[in-house]
Each structure stands twice: as structure tokens, then as C-alpha cells.
Amino acid sequence: MLQKAKKDFSSDKIIYGINTGFGPMAQYRIEDKSLTELQYNIIRSHSTGAGKPLPPLYVKAAMIARLFTFLQGKSGIHTELVELLVKFINLDIFPYIPEHGSVGASGDLVQLAHIALTLIGEGEVFYQGQLQPTAQVLEKNHLKPFSIHIREGLSVTNGTSVMTGIGIVNLIYARQLLNWSVCASVMMNEIAASYDDFVSQPLNDAKLHKGQQKIAEMMRVWMSDSKKYVTLMKKKLHLDM
């Protein structure tokens, strides 16, 4: 039965990315003997980025984002590929990814291809602070390059994991910057001995501006252990009574 299914697939089925070309070339059927070569070719042909390498932090974030996608179980890949990617992450083996390449609706094709290139033992990686041939780093860590099967070249290269990873890192940076900005603002107002009306909850609630209300709330938290403002608030409460 299995042999019959394989024979039927080879002779009758046309599945995009498995036995067809990619994009505008999807109209062309790929010969059975070239199916594996097709998957290697999509990786190698798209590993054409230019410019400086992405920082290791961005690369690691992209690898984690790609791993998360694989763990959904819908990419059509072998578990060995996932396991190798996990080892790369844990050992801080970072694929060399040039900063310039395709990014957009079709996915981070160039950037992800550079990740895929290292998983098959080719290209270069940053390891222990140095740019080294992937094959040498794999040998040092007793790892074997992954042997691509049908569809896996497409599965690894097609996605938006790089822009997602970079976006997550920048979101974390933005949150940190926001907290530092709020802290600095509170300190400046403390030094200037300014009134605390600008953080008044009733006053900010009247504005109906959620962003303003949130910042005022954050500032009140920072000011909660300020002797100056705590004393001022106590005086206001006493006057109100």
C-alpha cells in the first residue's frame, strides 16, 4: 500500500514547493530525481544578503521565533531539524545573517535562508565571539548537519521570524526606555519641587486619554516613596477633611 501511495504521488500529484518551482516558476513540474536538490537550491540561492551582520541578539530572537513556529507542528519538517535549531540556540551558535535582504509579505526569505544554510552545515556562524565556518563549529560541538527532505527547504526559508524577532527585541527596549523616561521625569519634578497636580488621578481621568492616564499612574507609583510628595498628599487630604 505504501509503495502504491508513493507511486501515485510521483505520477499524479502536483504539490507546490514539493514538486513544482517557486513563485512565478510554480507552473513548472520538477522531476522526481531532483526533489531533494530543489530544497537545497532554494536555501543556497536565497543566501544572498549584503551588508553588516545582524547583532547576535537579533539573530537569537529570530531563531527563537522560528522555533516557536516549528513547534506549532504545521511546517512539515522532521523533529531532527527542530532539535538542531534548539542546540544552536543553547550553544549560542549564531548564523551569519547580513542586514540587507528581502523583508516583506513573502517572508524574510534571504535572512531565513542564511539560518537554513547553517543548519545544513554550510555558510558561517558566530561562535564564541568569532566568525567561523559552520562545518568547523558543528564538528567542535559533535553536531551533524541536517539532511534536507522534500519541502523542508521551503519550510525553513519562508516566514517572518526575523522581523518578528527584531520587533520583539525592540519592543522590550521601548518598554525599558519608557520606564527610564518616566523615572527621569519624576526625578526632575522632585528636584524642581513642582506641584503634583500633573499626576492627579481625577485630573487625568477627566482628559479621557488612556496614554496620559497610564503615564500618570506609572509616575504615581514612582512617587509613592517620595517624602516630599507623600507629605504634600497628606496635607491635601487633611485640607479636604
Show which residues each predicted segment covers.
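N- or domain-start disorder-to-order transition segments that initiate the globular core
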Residues: 1-12, 65
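Polyanion/phosphate-binding surface patch
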Residues: 8-13, 28, 211, 215-216
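Glycine-rich loop at the start of a catalytic domain that most often binds anionic cofactors/ligands
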Residues: 24-38
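A short, basic-hydrophobic beta/loop patch
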Residues: 40, 46
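Active-site cavity-forming subdomains of large catalytic enzyme subunits
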Residues: 47-55, 61-209
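Accessory "access/gating" subregions that flank catalytic or transport cores
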Residues: 189-241
